[in-house]
């Protein structure tokens, strides 16, 4: 077994939701990072309430010994001129670089239905044309080049309601892109909800996986997502996602595969939930307890 060095962090989306700001609108940035620290996490991703100035954000985080792992970037490579996406990406890159992050989470939002309340995440998800696939692959490689200019990497986030959701779509993107320029984010919750096998994806692309999201899925709500043709956001409100150990996913074989692979990077606990229904601090503690007991994740000092 290879030596594994893992940084364990948690996303702010359980405290306040970027796609639906009304969820957790009363929660302050400082409350969120205080509770992350109290729960024992070492890092976080960037949420919509975080200070936009790197120096200010670093001050708040340093007081709590927290680090920034990454932050989401919405690309529109299939629907807009490349230059528009690149200009926004460079600003995003420079912010994350200033914060000491090594990877940049990128997801294509061209034709995406993930933010539309009236569109079924399954029935209405986009399917790219051959030309759009070419634009996506070429554009991602160019963004990868821009990231490498400052010693960073892009990690592509397969996501419900987008054109890269299924195993076949992930396979196509990985085949069409240079491994040195485009890496992969591995998200357990999105794979399971989509009906994919997370172990298959991890084992197939372990050499390209440079960032991990641990998200669990509630079986009943996942079934309702299909049966009732719900949108992604409606599913979030309905509670389809939860933290590891609270849903249907068996994380033990996934963790064993991660250990065997020698993965070196962040694992981010992530669960889009309504904080009025699922207290984010309690769920952060629940996830940490489960991960500590079940996997005994070795973390860097």
Curated annotation (Swiss-Prot):
Q: Which pathway features in its UniProt record? A: Polyol metabolism; myo-inositol degradation into acetyl-CoA; acetyl-CoA from myo-inositol: step 2/7
What PANTHER family does the annotation carry?
A: HYDROXYPYRUVATE ISOMERASE, INOSOSE DEHYDRATASE
Q: Which reaction does it catalyse?
A: scyllo-inosose = 3D-3,5/4-trihydroxycyclohexane-1,2-dione + H2O
Q: Does the keyword Manganese apply?
A: yes
What protein name does the entry list? Inosose dehydratase
**Naturally occurring in which organism (per UniProt):** Lacticaseibacillus casei (strain BL23) (Lactobacillus casei)
Q: Please list the GO terms describing molecular function.
A: manganese ion binding; myo-inosose-2 dehydratase activity
Q: What is its EC number?
A: 4.2.1.44
This protein's cofactor list reads: glutathione; Co(2+); Mn(2+)
- Keywords attached to this entry: Cobalt, Lyase, Manganese
Gene3D superfamilies for this protein: Divalent-metal-dependent TIM barrel enzymes
GO terms, biological process? inositol catabolic process
Query: Sorted alphabetically, which Pfam families does this protein's record hold?
Result: AP_endonuc_2 (PF01261)
Q: Does the keyword Lyase apply?
A: yes
Q: Which family does the record assign?
A: Belongs to the IolE/MocC family.
Main enzyme class: lyase
């Amino acid at each position: 077994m290879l030596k594994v060095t893992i940084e364990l962090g948690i996303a702010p989306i359980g405290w306040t939701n970027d796609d639906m700001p009304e969820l957790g609108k009363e929660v302050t940035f400082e409350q969120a990072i205080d509770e992350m620290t109290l729960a024992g996490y070492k890092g976080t991703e960037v949420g919509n309430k975080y200070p936009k100035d790197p120096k200010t954000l670093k001050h708040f985080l340093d007081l709590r010994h927290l680090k920034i792992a990454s932050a989401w970037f919405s690309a529109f490579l299939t629907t807009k001129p490349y230059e528009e996406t690149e200009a926004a990406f460079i600003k995003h890159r420079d912010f994350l670089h200033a914060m000491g992050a090594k990877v940049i989470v990128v997801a294509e939002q061209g034709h995406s239905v993930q933010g539309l309340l009236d569109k079924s995440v399954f029935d209405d998800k986009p399917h790219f044309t051959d030309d759009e696939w070419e634009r996506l692959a070429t554009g991602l490689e160019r963004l990868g080049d821009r990231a490498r200019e400052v010693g960073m990497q892009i990690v592509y986030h397969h996501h419900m309601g987008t054109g890269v959701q299924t195993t076949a779509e992930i396979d196509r993107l990985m085949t069409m892109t240079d491994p040195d320029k485009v890496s992969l984010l591995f998200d357990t919750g999105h794979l399971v909800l989509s009906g994919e096998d997370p172990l298959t994806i991890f084992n197939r692309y372990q050499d390209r996986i440079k960032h991990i999201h641990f998200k669990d899925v509630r079986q009943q709500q996942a079934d309702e997502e299909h049966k009732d043709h719900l949108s992604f956001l409606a599913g979030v409100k309905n509670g389809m996602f939860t933290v590891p150990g609270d849903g249907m996913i068996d994380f033990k074989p996934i963790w064993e595969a991660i250990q065997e692979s020698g993965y070196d990077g962040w694992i981010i606990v992530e669960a889009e939930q309504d904080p009025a229904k699922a207290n984010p601090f309690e769920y952060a503690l629940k996830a940490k307890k489960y991960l500590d007991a079940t996997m005994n994740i070795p973390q860097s000092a």
